[in-house]
């Protein structure tokens, strides 16, 4: 009989092993066997919990996205009520230390690539994109008409993705301060044009 809570413990252990395996070997090298070896468990247990490599990547990305959504919610709740503060909170969550760690960044890159070919991953990416745009648009809408807010949100979302992608591909540790500065300057410019 399995121990109570063992499922959650094993899944967390395997997701962590997946993040670190992708970090070290890339997605191609992140086989069920290599993840199992890193987690010091049998390949059969990985298959039991996730089915196959696609299921493992999907579960790993659900975990990463949940962390991002929780960080976004936490930062938005802590921010002042004005649009600038709320927008900066969303930006800060996207450049949070957890989201810009090597294992998570490499997993994001693998996920984006795979999401173009795998419907379950495409759906996750769609939900993530909609959530980001919804948050940004809602906050910009407090300072400008809805159509302008949509354009501003689209621009900031593209800037977040672009800064994140450049940082991920730079081969250097992610420069969070520089990314925050550029994104926050954009927010200030857009909002200043409406004041």
Curated annotation (Swiss-Prot):
Source species, domain of life: Bacteria
- MF-aspect GO terms: DNA-binding transcription factor activity; transcription cis-regulatory region binding
Q: In which pathway does it act?
A: Amine and polyamine biosynthesis; betaine biosynthesis via choline pathway [regulation]
What PROSITE patterns does the record tag this protein with?
HTH_TETR_1 (PS01081), HTH_TETR_2 (PS50977)
Q: Which residues bind DNA?
A: 31-50
Carries keyword Cell wall biogenesis/degradation?
no
Q: Pinpoint the HTH tetR-type domain residues.
A: 8-68
Please give the biological process terms from Gene Ontology that the record holds.
glycine betaine biosynthetic process from choline; negative regulation of DNA-templated transcription
Entry keywords, A to Z? DNA-binding, Repressor, Transcription, Transcription regulation
Q: What does this protein do?
A: Repressor involved in the biosynthesis of the osmoprotectant glycine betaine. It represses transcription of the choline transporter BetT and the genes of BetAB involved in the synthesis of glycine betaine.
- The protein here is known as HTH-type transcriptional regulator BetI
Gene that specifies this protein? betI
